[in-house]
Amino acid sequence: VETSFVPMDFLTANIELLDEKKAQTTYKIEYVSKYVEKWLFVMSNVDEVKNINFIDCMCNAGIYKDGDKGTAIKVLKLFNDFALQHTDKTFNLIINDISPDRLRIITTIINDYVGVKATNINIVTRNMDVNAFLSDEEFFKKYFNCYPKRSSNLVFVDPYNFCTVKISMLEK
């Protein structure tokens, strides 16, 4: 278990909006982070790929009650490491959550505590229901078609509420 990277007063002030972390959540974050790291290693070394997109469809607050980082924050830290080494690529972290309060928390964490140093990272936030978000074709075209056949995209839908996701939206 890692030490919280945000001040205790920030955690305390937002504790009612944060989730308890279950054992399977720890494993999920670990597995997704390891997968993303391997994906980034491969895609950032493919000359033709210029645009690397990670989309977290239900990002939550970015932190848990115990102070551990959520998936989107872990991915952002990986993006920062890879973006500093691969300045010819653009890294887009697209995060969505239905709760404006949780988006406020994750945005504050990103802006105040993560310490992104790479200038080739874009962070885009959306406040939508997961199905409305996934069906917003114009939005996704903007990121997926920036460089025809030159984007690598990873869409993450947390299995926590996966039963609410319309699979047909992912197929598009």
Regions found by a protein language model. Give the residues of each.
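N-terminal accessory segments
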Residues: 1-17, 22-24, 42
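Short flexible/disordered coil segments
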Residues: 6-13, 111-123, 160-165
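SAM cofactor-binding core of SAM-dependent methyltransferases
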Residues: 18, 31-139
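Hydrophobic (often cysteine-bearing) scaffold residues that line and stabilize catalytic clefts
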Residues: 28
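Active-site segment flanking the S-adenosylmethionine/decSAM binding pocket
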Residues: 125-172
